[in-house]
């Protein structure tokens, strides 16, 4: 899935991490652990294509991330493979209900309304938040917003999950 060759990222002249080489195959898990400021979030932002490496190349499905992002159609396909959840979760749509928030991605993929509804209901049940489906963002607590953000990731059924502290702020339920 991913191959990273001699990846370096610098803030101005300061390297965030040493040159990195790794491969992540389909079905594998990679967990990044380290102190605050050690570059974990930066690394995820690089894999997501939100940051450009100072040096090195990132490959996804044997094609460089640069090539994926050059063409708008390829870029859309790349992001269709990704599920991204960063620590800050206040990304809900303006006045959309939770249900409409969760339906946004599947509708962009042009899934049928039946399939969209099934995916949404499965995610709401899994996360035990069915009671939130008609709520709007300002009515939700921080933990509820986090669960909705996680549901919006799961409903897309991506090939790759990029998670940055996905369970921070959640209760153990």
Residue locations for each model-derived region?
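The feature captures the beta-strand-to-loop junction immediately N-terminal to the Walker
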Residues: 33-35
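Conserved ABC transporter NBD signature motif
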Residues: 56-67, 78
